[in-house]
Amino acid sequence: MPNLLSRLRGLRPALTRRAFWLWAALITLLRCAVTHFQLAYMWAGGAPLDDELMFRAANAITSGQWLGEYDYLTLSKSMFFAVWLALLNKLHLPYLLGGALLWCAAALLAAFALRPLWRKSPAGQARALTLLLYALLAFLPSSWASYTLRVYRDNIFPALCLLFFAGMAGAALRAVFYTRQQAPIWPWLLAAGVGLACGYLNREDAGLFLLPFAIAATLCMLVVLLHRRRWLCAAAQVIPYAVLAAGVGIFCALNQHWYGVWGLSDFSEGSFADAMGAMTRVATDSDEPLLSVPADAREKLYTEIPQLQCLQYWLEEDPQRQNDFRDPELDDYRAGSFYWAIRRAAQYEGIYADAATADAYWQSVADAINAACDNGTLPARSGRRSATSQPIRAQYVLPAIREAAKSALWALTFQDCPAYYQTLRSIGTTEDVAQWSAYLHCNFNNAAEAGKDTPYYAPLQKLAYRALGVLRCVYAVLLPLAFVWAVVRHLCALPMLLRRRTAGAALPWLLLFGLLAMAALRCGMIAFVEVSSFGIGTSTMYLSTVHPLLLLYTYGCLICYRNKGVIAE
């Protein structure tokens, strides 16, 4: 590996500014061309909680009705993706192409963000290094993997997160290595704010993933800027949080206007979260980790909590609820499905007639359960809590660590990243497919092979998929090797960092460590949900924000520490 890097350094390719942008345009064109060979995936009637929910909300936005008629799903998830779909529809931009363009924009910004790490290189070589990083990010296999073909929010979530990380990294590096006149940091902070706000509004868990990095980066920049008396730049640190507050405020105001709910969700926050947290307090004889409110706990609740008795038939006897949500192997509701089952049961009882009725009902349930647990009427296994997720227990620790390690290796080797669905074919009537195609301006893989139920792909499409499969294999081999060497170089730079103790030495090291830490955090978050609630196996879709972070860390370390020592201020 050292010999290979030495030879690559000896080549020293140089680019003019015009050549750089021509190559960047060509890379973007080729990356967008990938979507020409891909077909989107849909399942009308089979994904009411996910793809159909987003599609329904997007159509409502287009019709001027915000998220549509209120029911148990309307405010159950963060809905920025529905706004994105409505925007693409307004622009007449194909769904898959829109996602690819957003990814390319975030990738290009990320490549420029890290450019100060090789600022000492000649201008032509620095452009070549920037272009190479952009190309590697643009064609990252996870960015065109099959999960992106679903009409779901994870199509854009990795790009939004990359936009945020690029903005914060770009601002931090320029705060250290340049003056305000040489390179202002406010545009980078604005980009970070857009990524933070849109990501936060796109997934409920985005705050836990993005805000730690935002706070750490802000504190590091403040230390540097205040020490150098750059007061305006220090004041500009409020920009990302102001953009986030504005985005959240707009969504909350719209929800208040249309549904009377000041909040982003009536699922992960508010009275329903209180009720779910209260239900998980009830003691149970079950030791199955995937169950949050097992059958014996529900029986105790039906007996002692009158408000829940109306839901008993739907949860315990109705055959459709059993088929839709109950795990046949466990003969019970997994934690990741129980909250949807009980919300739908409440829908059938008229509880979701409007937001105020639903809020009052779930608050009464939460208050009754907590009171019963506090006075001993119901046996309790924990204190009061408000959450739809499982509480952290000792039984989850080791399985979560194992799953997190598996997830990191899964992401490093780009597992489950085919560019198409090999066996899953879009399901829906001719009218359904026509409606989705017309709104999203793209085609779906609903055609079947002759005599089979697998999707049909043209010979040229199959050829493109094979080429992308080869590219995935190249990434899967080279990134793990480069990653190991990057970790070695990163650790070897630590002693010199401790000796020098300057901002120019410390901040790049800390920044790269932060990117790696965020990748680890995401693996840990998804691992906990997997072992405590889902039990669906390692998922590329949920780990899709990890791949670009690993690449940025690896590339940054290999370039930043390609020579002995730490880059100078």
Identify the function of each model-found stretch.
Residues Y95-G124, T130, A159, L163-G167:
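Transmembrane-helix motifs of polytopic, lipid-linked glycan transferases
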Residues A44-L49, L53-M54, Y241-V397:
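Juxtamembrane membrane-water interface segments immediately following transmembrane helices
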Residues L93-L102, C373-L516:
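Membrane-interface anchor segments at the N-terminal boundary of transmembrane helices
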Residues W188-R203, L244-F251:
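Membrane-interface alpha helices of multi-pass inner-membrane proteins
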Residues L39-A57, W66-W84:
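Extracytoplasmic catalytic/substrate-binding loops of multi-pass membrane glycan-assembly enzymes
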Residues T16-A47, A138-L140, V243-L254, A519-C523:
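Transmembrane signal-anchor helices characteristic of membrane glycosylation enzymes that use polyprenol
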Residues G98-W103, L136, L140-A169, G199-P212, ...:
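Multi-pass, polyprenyl lipid-linked donor-dependent membrane glycosyltransferases
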Residues M1-H36, L129-T130, A235-A236, R499-L511, ...:
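Start-transfer (signal-anchor) and selected internal transmembrane alpha helices
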